[in-house]
C-alpha cells in the first residue's frame, strides 16, 4: 500500500502534537509517593494519586504557594495527612457510620489516572476511584468517583459521584482546602453575611445568623448554610484575594485550630485558614438512586501577590 510523503509528514506532525499535548502533565516520585505535576502558562500544581490530594498550587506570577503544607508533613502520611486540598468522600467530618474514619476513605485511597488533555484554556487531568475490598469494609456500595482538575486562568475542581450500585446511597462530601496565609489575624472571609451558622463543636443546628465579614483569629469550626456560592478570602498581609465560586454543595465550613493540633505546630496554625465547600451533617446528605450522578464543582480565582 502506497502512502504519500505528505501523509507521512502529517502523521509525524500529529504524533509530535500528541506528545506536546500532554507535555505539561508529568508523573514523578516524591518520597516514595506517586505524584503528578501540571504546568502551563497559567501556573503549576502538584497532585498526589493517594487521595487525589492537590498538594501545591502556584498561579503564574505568584511569589507564594496558595496552599499550606505543615513542615512536619511526610508524603507517606497517615489518614490525617493535613495540608493541600484533601477530598472528603463519601462522608464529611464524623458523619459516616459509627466507628469509621472522619472525612471518609477517598482521602487515603489510590486514584487512577483516567485522562489528560491540553486545551487553549488550560491543562486538564482526570482521576478516578472505584470500589475495592478495603472500601467495601467500611462502605458496602458500588460507585464511580471521578475528579477533574483544570489548571487554567482559574483552578477548577469537579468531583462527580455516580451510583453504580443497585441500591440508593446517601452521601455527604466536600473539599477541605488549607489556604496558606501570611497571618490569619490579617485575613477576612466575605460572602457569609446573613448566613445561618452553627459551631460544629457544640451543635449541628444552624440557628444563629452571621453578620459582616468573618475574621478567623482563634479556634473555629463554624458551618455556614449558604445563601450564595461566592466567598472571598482576603489576606491583607500579602495583598492577595482568593475567590471561591461553585455549585453542588450547601455549606461552607471554616476551621482553624487554637495553637498546636496533632501534627500542626502553634506556628503552623497562624499560617492557614480552612474554608471548605461541603455538604455535611446527615440530615443534609443527598440520596442518589441507582445510576444517578451528583457533581460538586469549585472554581478558584486568585489575584494579588
Predicted regions located by residue number:
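Active-site/ligand-binding surface loops and adjacent short beta/alpha elements
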Residues: 168-170, 174-251
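Extended, loop-rich substrate-binding clefts of extracytoplasmic carbohydrate-active enzymes
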Residues: 27-30, 100-152
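Hydrophobic h-region of N-terminal signal peptides that target proteins for export
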Residues: 13-21
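Active-site pocket scaffolds in enzymes
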Residues: 68-70, 88, 242-305
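Bacterial N-terminal signal peptides that target proteins for export
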Residues: 1-9
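Beta-strand-rich N-terminal accessory domains
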Residues: 21-82, 228-251, 292-305
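Beta-strand/loop-rich accessory regions of lumenal/periplasmic or secreted enzymes
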Residues: 78-106, 190-199, 203, 213
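Acidic, contiguous internal or C-terminal segments within carbohydrate-active enzymes
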Residues: 56, 131-171, 175-176
